[in-house]
């Protein structure tokens, strides 16, 4: 029996855990977005 790959991508899970709405819902998440804006990231969140 072999171990499975741990990354099984799902669009819904990705956006719910790391998405923009999730980031905006907490104060620390807003800090993350602010940092990424300050750094000049093209993509702010998943």
Curated annotation (Swiss-Prot):
HAMAP family: Ribosomal_bL34 (MF_00391). One of its GO terms (molecular function) is structural constituent of ribosome. Signal peptide: none annotated. Residues 32-46 have a biased composition (Basic residues). GO terms for cellular component: ribonucleoprotein complex; ribosome. InterPro entries: Ribosomal_bL34, Ribosomal_bL34_CS. Keywords: Ribonucleoprotein, Ribosomal protein. Residues 24-46 are annotated as: Disordered. GO terms for biological process: translation. This is Large ribosomal subunit protein bL34. It comes from Lactobacillus acidophilus (strain ATCC 700396 / NCK56 / N2 / NCFM). Pfam families: Ribosomal_L34 (PF00468). Belongs to the bacterial ribosomal protein bL34 family.
